[in-house]
Regions:
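Extracytoplasmic soluble-region selector
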Residues: 1-38
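Solvent-exposed, well-ordered loop and adjacent helix/strand elements within mature globular domains
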Residues: 39-172
Length: 172
């Protein structure tokens, strides 16, 4: 991706630029969400959701092994994909980070791209759905909407360690 512009591109033949509309904040960066339907060929060909300020200003994480309801789509996705992690313990499906977010952004298995104001793109796949009935959850996420993106991680590598998402990805 060309992160030096106000637009992002996947460099695939016939692909169009997707202009980032700058709404909402994530720490120091403004965030736009570009949704892709699974197995689409062109980047950003799904719908765009603009996250309003002050939502989305923190990242959280959860252990992938905590998804234990065998009949759920979350569990089926975890088993089907083999529960793979990168060297830092982030859950990965292919080249995408496994994330949890509210149904505002899609359903289990959907590919979701979060475009930050600096042009960086967090390429995610929805591996868990945040519970809208949880105290403090709204349509954007937990903690009153401040936690829009929750990364799914290797619980044994992350819990009780003081690790943070931005420790491994300060560019976010």
């Amino acid at each position: 991706y060309d992160f030096g512009r106000d637009q992002t591109k996947d460099k695939k033949p016939g692909s169009v630029f997707v202009k980032s509309v700058r709404k909402g904040e994530i720490n120091w960066a403004v965030i736009t969400v570009i949704l892709r339907v699974k197995d689409q060929d062109s980047y950003g060909s799904g719908k765009t959701i603009n996250i309003p300020s002050p939502y989305g200003d923190s990242f959280t994480y959860m252990g992938w092994s905590l998804i234990t309801s065998t009949g759920s789509n979350q569990y089926k996705l975890r088993v089907k994909t083999g529960e793979h992690y990168d060297a830092n313990g982030f859950g990965k499906i292919g080249d995408r980070y496994v994330i949890a977010c509210t149904p505002t952004f899609g359903k289990i298995g959907d590919e979701i791209d979060f475009v930050l104001a600096n042009g960086r793109v967090i390429h995610g796949v929805m591996g868990d759905e945040k519970n809208m009935s949880d105290a403090g959850c709204n349509k954007w996420g937990h903690d009153g909407g401040h936690s829009v993106v929750e990364f799914v991680v290797n619980k044994s590598m992350w819990y009780h360690t003081g690790k943070t998402v931005t420790r491994f990805h300060p560019e976010w």
